[in-house]
Amino acid sequence: MNHCFRCFSIVLLFFLSCMSYLFGQEQTLSTVDTGYELWMNYKPLPESGLKQSAIRYGSHITLPGSRYDEVIREELERALKALLTVTPIFVQDNAVGIQMSFCKDKGLGEEGYIIRSGKKRITLQAYSDAGFLYGTFHLIRLIQCGYPLEQLNLKEIPALEFRMINHWVGLGGTVERGYAGKGLWAWDDLPKKIEPRYTDYARAEASIGINAVILNNVNADPRILGHDYLEKVAALADIFRKYHIKVYLAPNFAAPVKPSTTKDAGKQWGGVGIGHLDTADPLNPEVQKWWTDKVNEIYSLIPDFGGFLVKANSEGMAGPQDYHRSHVDGANMLARALKPHGGIVLWRTFVYNPEIDKDRMKRSYKEFQPLDGQFDENVVLQTKNGTLDFQPSEPAQPLFGAMRHTPLFPELQITQEYLGRSVSLVYLLPMWRQTFLDFDTYCNGKGSTVSNIITGKTFSSRMLGMAGVGNIGRSRNWTAHHFAKANWYAFGRLAWNPEESTESITSDWIKSTWNCDEATLEVIRQMMMPTWESFVCAHAPYSLGFTVKREDHYTAGFEQRANKEWHVSKESIGTDRTTKGTNYVSQYFKYNKDIFNSLSQCPELYLLCFHNVPWSYKMKSGKSLREEFKSNLKRGIEQVDVNIGLWKSIQNKIDPVRYEEVLQSLYKEQRDTKAFYQAALNFFSQYW
């Protein structure tokens, strides 16, 4: 009965909200917003001088004659009709409006562009075709977000050549660490049935600068390399190519092996291999030929195939070490098969063999840093931002700055595996900025930030890129939680330019997603910006380490983790990773080693990662660690309570469907956060 009444109440609230909009509220809706349009939520702009200026420019358009003209035209028509309520006229040459043309500035590269404006026209120039695609989306964003269009003088060149989204999608549609429904690709229907959603997905990625997509899970089902699946992959590649996006695959390293000869650990798909060999030894000539033939087959179907992303000798996945070979042997074998076609290998460094070191945080560095300079020129090491496993807070991976002769691509996690799934509103951009991109490694002295390293400013690199593990699924609004889209958007903007300001990225997402006025924008910004810090305080205080259950990475799991992965007693808490402990601090350059090694100098954000600290220790706040720890556990509840109030305060500024869905998400977050707090309180009370 209570359940029925609650459902009725929600439906009634939705109905009344809709009616209030139809009969005189501040915003009139012609369509129902579901969130499907993401940040390309083109709605009529309010009447203003800025709108009239945009109408003057947007009335006539000259296309450049690029291979992307068709999608550029479609996007401009869609955007300008909706935003300005005008239908642009496309002409061969014009002295007014928007004029696109090729220029001779080779410095713009394959994807750069220049946007300039005078009184009568806006010029968009590029050296190569893709520059017009990205420049078009930038121009639309300027109009959509209400930027002045007069006196524009913008020059954009992506800082990173490879801007990648990793989809951990299985062939059965499941998404590992996915919380927005099944995976996007309907494998069973491909290649015959092409869903419109695939094109909309490509539009979304191109609009934020993404140019590479890994289609399948790194815990790879070997069947992805079968000819039938390669034809499905080719069908997706044909769609994505229109938006300057290359496809990549994650192969199973043991794919050449006969299914009947594989280890038990790999038999969840009926055996690891799909081949005819008795070995996957990378130095075996037959294995090398198998991969060469397979790569040739792939390129016969997908001429612009990007390459392979490989998870090897990690969490049960096969790899070269199964045959007493090195990561170098495995990566280079695949790289040589791909090189004639221009493909690359992204070899993941997420390994934590306990035989390497007792401290898990030291293992990746110890396994890969000695291999610097031994990988072939088309090999990249794809490396998580931190040393543990996408924790709410952890120090930056010390491999960044320690491998001068091997390209490293950061792997960030957009999906919220340890940060509240699709339940919690947690904005990840501040985390990526503070704990990773702005971290100064001191590998070349002061100013050697991770951002400067990955963009080639600190020292040169053969390839520059960044990968993000996607949070996208078949949920109607793509990410389940409407605010999770902000993390997808922010990743794309960061991958284009890691120095882009947090304020600019955040404001643009709010404006283009919620179509709101400045006052509403400020309320939404107030909701978003503190969420990461509050989540850390409540769920992973002072970078303590894993605090959630191994089974779900969501519910409180202090009993599972305590005194196994971090230490706690009535006297103290935290793990000693100083020179007197596990000596993890020595993987950092001297400046950071000394800071992390000192209890008084160590940033409090990382205090319990590096030190076992007495509960009585005096914090910067003046409180004891015990007092501040206990107080901070409430921060999650306090934040969601504030956000519920803020969200309710702008109800009449938000469309009713998305308003109600976000409100219900906040209520769910409130319930789960209270449960987590109570579990934490119950556990730690025995030590206070």
Where are these regions (language model features)?
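Bacterial Sec-dependent N-terminal signal peptides
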Residues: M1-T28
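Acidic carboxylate-rich catalytic motifs and surrounding loops in phosphoryl-/glycosyl-chemistry enzymes
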Residues: F90-D93, W347-N353, E522
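Catalytic-core regions of glycoside hydrolase
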Residues: D189, T261, G275-S507, T513
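Catalytic domains of carbohydrate-active enzymes that cleave complex glycans
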Residues: G447-W688
